[in-house]
Every structure is written in C-alpha cells, then in structure tokens.
Curated annotation (Swiss-Prot):
Annotated ranges, domain KH type-2: 204-282
Recorded superkingdom: Bacteria
Subunit record text: Monomer.
Annotated function: An essential GTPase that binds both GDP and GTP, with rapid nucleotide exchange. Plays a role in 16S rRNA processing and 30S ribosomal subunit biogenesis and possibly also in cell cycle regulation and energy metabolism.
Keyword Aminoacyl-tRNA synthetase annotated: no
GO cellular component terms attached to this protein's record: cytosol; plasma membrane
Gene of this entry: era
Region of interest (G1), ranges: 14-21
Record domain Era-type G: where: 6-173
Residues in the signal sequence: none
Chief location: cytoplasm
Location of region: G4: 123-126
Protein name: GTPase Era
Keyword entries, A-Z: Cell membrane, Cytoplasm, GTP-binding, Membrane, Nucleotide-binding, Ribosome biogenesis, RNA-binding, rRNA-binding
Length: 301
C-alpha cells in the first residue's frame, strides 16, 4: 500500500547574500527567485513549488533580514517575520565562508520565539575546511536547539537530496495545493519584471540597484508569429540614476534589455521583443502609494 501524500510550507530565511535564492532555484530547477551578489535582492515572497509522487513542498523565499533603513526595508523585514508564523518548517540559511555575524544573532533571537521547527542550513561548505565546519556547527548548536543542522552547497547541490529527505520526514499528510507541473504561484508579469530587475542589479553599481522597481506596462502576442512584445518601465529615484541605467549612447540599457530578453525567452519558450523605458519617481521607496503601485502591498503580507 502506498504512503499517504504529504505537503507543507517551508520558509527560507537568513541574512542577505547567504544563498537563499540559489538554493530555491536549485531545488525547483528553474530560475524563479532572482539572484545577485547585492544585498536585498529578493523583495516579495516568491513561492516555489516542488512536487514529487510522495509530497509537495511550497517554498517561500523571504527577503534577507536586516535592520531597516527606509519604508521598503521595513516592509521587507515585516514580510520575513510574518512568514515564520505561517509555515510548517523554517530553513535558516547561513554562509559558512563568513561565519557567525550580528545579523545571524538578530535572526536567532526572532526564531527562538516561534513554535515552528527550524533547520539550520550551513551553505557554501565548498569554501571552508572540514575542521572549520565542525567548529561552526558547535558554535551554532550552543546558540539554539535546531531540529536539524545540515551542511550544503546550494550552488553545487551538495547534500540537497538529504535536505529534501529530512524535509519530507517533517511534513504532515496533506493535499496537493498546486498542479504537479506548476513551479510558482507568481504571475508571469511578476517573474518577467524580476528578470529585468536582476540584470539591472548585475550590471549597475552603487546606489542604483536598491532604487529600482520594474513595472510591466503590457504584454502582447502576435497571433501569426507567436512573438511577444513586452513593454517595461524601470523606475528610479534620481535623474543621475536614470543616466547610469541608460548609459553612454544608450549602451547600458541595451545590455540590460538584451540579457533580460534571453532570460525571458528561456522562461516563456517563445521569441520576445522587449522595449524598456526609464522613469524617475523621486523617493518612491518611502512613499506608501508608490510601493503599492510597484507591487508591494502591505495587505498581502
């Protein structure tokens, strides 16, 4: 007789840049959470759905927890903390190569107040010596009674099958919330805007990245050629940032568009014509109505 089907929700939390999105994308096998080496890349809860014949795990990739500097930062931390209460299991991801930091201490204090089981995932184990890993495990074991401590490499996939096995063991009997072939509950527009924002994050520097929102103005399909025309606007806070994103003779914007188009075509499996505009909206991160316009709705979180 076959085992009953299990399902549950798992939150992935940790300081910015510890590899949370890399882990989610490795498990799901398709890029759905944007990755960059700049902190605070993930803004909205991105849900990845991992389904096998035995179970379904719905992953929530929260923003990196940090002390907020503005309304958007405050909003991002609020999402992460609220998530702790809503899920069946928490993955607390740390970066083995940087060791214990004050940001980790901040998160552990929050985790001690929740009833949800917590797995400590020590990521980037390929970057440290085994004896340093053992010391790190002991250090964290003294700080909190974790349900499991699992060393992994999200980038290379080391020990990820074991992590999924342990996760399944912690799930309750439950329904299949999403169809078997669905990997995220975000609409295509959201993922397209995130893929464009990823290229802005990777290609620009300094103050520009965190001052960027991307709005998809329209998507049209040509019925004859099946080609998609996507119109997008990149929102920045200052005209100097607009200049950086457009670049000399429009070269930077061209690069952003070209790289984003390839990612979007890979995601959608069809040819895309991508048109991008850049618009200045002063201090949008501190204005509640702009946050809502650009997809950050407090009510949903």
């Amino acid at each position: 007789m076959s085992e009953p089907f299990k399902s549950g929700f798992v939150a992935i939390v940790g300081r910015p840049n510890v590899g949370k999105s890399t882990l989610l994308n490795h498990i799901i096998g398709q890029k759905i959470a944007i990755m960059s080496d700049k902190a605070q890349t993930t803004r909205n809860k991105v849900q990845g759905v991992y389904t096998t014949d035995e179970s379904q795990i719905i992953f929530i990739d929260t923003p990196g927890i940090h002390k907020p500097k503005h309304k958007l930062g405050d909003f991002m931390v609020k999402i992460a903390l609220n998530t702790f209460q809503e899920v069946d299991l928490i993955y607390f991801v740390i970066d083995a190569s940087t060791g214990f930091g004050r940001g980790d201490e901040f998160i552990i204090e929050k985790l001690k107040n929740v009833q949800t089981p917590v797995f400590l995932l020590i990521n980037k184990i390929d970057l440290i010596a085994p004896e340093d890993l053992f010391k790190l495990i002991e250090q964290y074991r003294d700080l909190m009674d974790f349900d499991e401590i699992i060393p992994i490499s999200a980038l290379q996939g080391n020990n990820v099958p074991n992590l999924l096995e342990q996760t399944n063991a912690n799930l309750e009997i439950g329904p299949m919330y999403y169809p078997k072939d669905q990997i995220t509950d975000h609409p295509e527009r959201f993922i397209i805007s995130e893929l464009i924002r990823e290229q802005v994050l990777q290609l620009t520097r300094e103050e520009v990245p965190h001052s960027v929102a991307v709005v998809i103005e329209g998507i049209e399909k040509n019925p004859k050629t099946e080609k998609l025309t996507i119109n997008a606007t990149i929102i920045v806070e200052r005209s100097t940032q607009k200049g950086i994103i457009i670049g000399k003779q429009g070269q930077m914007l061209k690069q952003i568009g070209m790289r984003a188009r390839k990612e979007i075509e890979r995601l959608l499996g069809s040819k895309v014509f991508l048109e991008i505009w850049v618009k200045v909206q002063k201090n949008w991160r501190d204005k509640e109505h702009y946050l809502q316009d650009y997809g950050f709705d407090r009510e949903e979180y």
